[in-house]
UniProtKB/Swiss-Prot annotation:
Keywords: Glycoprotein, Secreted, Signal, Sporulation. Its main location: secreted. It comes from Dictyostelium discoideum. It is found in: Secreted. This is Spore germination protein 1. GO terms for biological process: spore germination; sporulation resulting in formation of a cellular spore. Belongs to the Dictyostelium gerABC family. Glycans are attached at N54, N118. The lineage of its organism: Eukaryota, Amoebozoa, Evosea, Eumycetozoa, Dictyostelia. Residues 1-25 form the signal peptide.
Amino acid sequence: MNIKNSLILIISTIFVLSMINGGLTSDPTCVGAPDGQVYLFSSWDFQGERYVYNISQGYLSLPDGFRNNIQSFVSGADVCFVKWYPSEQYQITAGESHRNYAALTNFGQRMDAIIPGNCSNIVCSPK
């Protein structure tokens, strides 16, 4: 076997193994969030349970499994991530993604809600 064939075999093996292990699906471009949607994940690296938020939903108090548990996300829209008490807000833009959002800012472990548009649109917390 010559060097060229050996390299082709090695590269093909790496490619196949990465597909089997899900390595290629961890890329946010593969996960893909369509325009107007945000994918929220309960595990880092775009894994675990996935919640699909659509901006047509307006204000959303996160469901129990995701409240204080956003580990990674992919955004196809401008949205505001919110923590009500004490008040914190993070502006997220379309095309933004984080593999380990909880570790990066620790905010994923405190997040309560998501609001479409800019954080400046927030007037007060819901009662």
